[in-house]
């Protein structure tokens, strides 16, 4: 079964690898060959033995270069997402200034919405220690719930007839994909046994995406357009 990957590379990411690859074609060949190699390893490597996988990665210079590439790409993506997060914050602040939010449920960005500080999570805990011991289709969801436990944000709003938190909405969006797409589960298990450097970069990426998603959900829940949509939906 072929393994297709759609890749979008920003200019900042490409500049960081310009010295390592003579041309973009060489970079793309290396990237897609790496994913094909990963897909093949999913079939032959026993994922129940993480020591076997780690030793295989450490002994293979090609795989070590690949994991360095992925880690650097994620860190570059984090920088882009931080800029996006600041842009979202400015947009929400402009909504407050224009009174687009509920007058009764108006919230303060500085008091109720907190940026994630990576310093609080700069620990040497590998990602596989956060995952449950048993493997299954819920491993990815369990990882998200573990992040929620660390962030202490899994709180349902008692004033809403339905669960109001972004955690509930994210679970609704993610769970069907995790249960139906087997390759996503395999890929999440594969990254769970990656070296600690890559695991931490993936973990920080999840936290940053979570921060952006939570901001959007909290703003939309209090936005007048959502109120109008709810009124029309009731009819």
Swiss-Prot record:
A GO cellular-component term linked to this record:
membrane
Q: Provide the membrane topology annotation.
A: Multi-pass membrane protein
Q: Where mainly located?
A: membrane
Q: Where is the signal peptide?
A: none
For whether the record's keyword set contains Repressor, the answer is: no
State which residue ranges cross the membrane. 167-187, 190-210
What keywords tag this UniProt record? Membrane, Transmembrane, Transmembrane helix
Which portions of this protein are annotated as coiled-coil regions?
none
> Any idea what a deletion of this gene does?
Cannot grow under anaerobic growth conditions.
What is the annotated localization of this protein?
A: Membrane
The further comment given in this record reads: Partially overlaps NUM1. Disruption phenotypes caused by deletion of this gene may also be a result of a defect in its overlapping gene.
Query: What name goes with this protein?
Result: Putative uncharacterized membrane protein YDR149C
């Amino acid at each position: 079964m072929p393994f297709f990957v759609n890749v979008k590379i920003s200019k900042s990411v490409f500049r960081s690898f310009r010295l390592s690859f003579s041309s973009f074609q060489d970079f793309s060949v290396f990237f897609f060959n790496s994913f094909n190699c990963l897909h093949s390893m999913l079939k032959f490597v026993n994922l129940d033995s993480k020591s076997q996988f780690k030793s295989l990665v450490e002994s293979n210079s090609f795989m070590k270069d690949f994991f360095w590439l992925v880690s650097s790409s994620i860190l570059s993506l984090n920088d882009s997402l931080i800029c996006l997060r600041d842009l979202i914050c400015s947009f929400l602040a402009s909504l407050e200034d224009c009174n687009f939010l509920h007058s009764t449920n108006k919230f303060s960005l500085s008091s109720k919405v907190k940026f994630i500080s990576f310093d609080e999570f700069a620990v040497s805990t590998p990602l596989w220690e956060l995952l449950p011991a048993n493997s299954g289709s819920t491993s990815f969801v369990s990882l998200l719930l573990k992040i929620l436990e660390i962030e202490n944000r899994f709180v349902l709003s008692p004033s809403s007839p339905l669960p109001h938190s972004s955690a509930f909405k994210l679970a609704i969006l993610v769970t069907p994909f995790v249960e139906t797409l087997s390759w996503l589960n395999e890929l999440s298990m594969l990254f769970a046994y990656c070296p600690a450097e890559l695991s931490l970069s993936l973990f920080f990426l999840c936290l940053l995406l979570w921060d952006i998603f939570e901001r959007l959900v909290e703003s939309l829940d209090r936005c007048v357009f959502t109120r109008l949509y709810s009124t029309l939906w009731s009819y």
